[in-house]
Amino acid sequence: MTHQNPFYGIHAATVAPMRPDFSLDEAALASHVSAVSRVAGIRGLLINGHAGENFYLTRDEMRRVVEIARASVPATCWLTAGINAESSIEAARQAVDAEKAGANALLVFPPNSWALHHDASMVEAHHSHVIGVTSLPIVLYQAPVGD
């Protein structure tokens, strides 16, 4: 059966293992994503999500997570990379990095500052900025960030 929708099947959220000094444990990450991607029924992985420390990792570390995941999972494993930034410019930079590093799709998180105030034009502008720099499919993360 051929699937038109690349998001079919199970997509598992992964963690980003950290060392005691708070640096990314690249070997543990490679082992983790490799193991999770090979579980029966898994079609894809979410990397750089909340459990993937996307609030904590630097931009370079987020890019590195995508690179390590891409090198550690089967080519058929769909990688969706989380994008989480307060600034639309930084979110766009993360999107470009993720695409270049081998992500297949992006999950764009809302800026936390929207908890204070946001309107429809802000939401549209932020996501349009990210969409404008990448050819990847984008999933919008819904979170309660205010009214």
What are these regions (language model features)?
Residues 2-147:
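Active-site beta->alpha loop and helix N-cap motifs at the rims of alpha/beta catalytic domains
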